[in-house]
């Protein structure tokens, strides 16, 4: 029988990524939902409380931000006001120590330069690790498939 500890980093055995308990999946779903709630509310402090000290933020159009201080500074500098985030196709896989979450999103936002609401459509990838009995976000990466004014229908929905 294969063990996750025996498998090399270059070849993840699929059985190792199907060991999350229902409770762990629910906990991760709750963390994801809270993140979105805090992001919309601009509650940076609560959002950062969900993160590990070695959090990594990998935006699609900028250099990665590594560590709590850099990620916190990036989030605080936000020039965009998020009005809502809709999540679809959320999937969570992992083991009892590490998990990943992938989902599609549709975000309604406005910028400090232009108050006209716009939309972004894309996907994001999260990696979470269980540390001292609690799940913590260790990496967030996302892609943007398209942008549109709120009055324009966005394809791919």
Where in this protein do the model-derived segments appear?
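A beta-strand edge to alpha-helix "cap/lid" segment located at domain peripheries
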Residues: 6, 13-49, 56-157
């Amino acid at each position: 029988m294969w063990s996750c500890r025996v498998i090399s980093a270059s070849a993840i055995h699929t059985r190792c990524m199907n060991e999350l308990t229902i409770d762990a999946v629910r906990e991760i779903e709750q963390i994801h939902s809270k993140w979105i709630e805090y992001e919309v509310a601009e509650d940076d402090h609560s959002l950062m409380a969900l993160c590990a000290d070695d959090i990594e933020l990998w935006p699609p159009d900028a250099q990665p931000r590594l560590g709590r201080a850099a990620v916190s500074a990036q989030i605080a500098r936000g020039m965009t006001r998020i009005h809502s985030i809709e999540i679809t196709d959320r999937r969570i896989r992992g083991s009892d120590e590490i998990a990943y979450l992938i989902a599609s999103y549709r975000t309604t936002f406005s910028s400090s330069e232009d108050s006209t609401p716009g939309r972004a459509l894309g996907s994001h990838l999260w990696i979470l690790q269980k540390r001292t009995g609690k799940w913590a976000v260790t990496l967030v990466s996302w892609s943007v498939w398209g942008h549109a004014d709120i009055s324009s229908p966005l394809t791919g929905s």
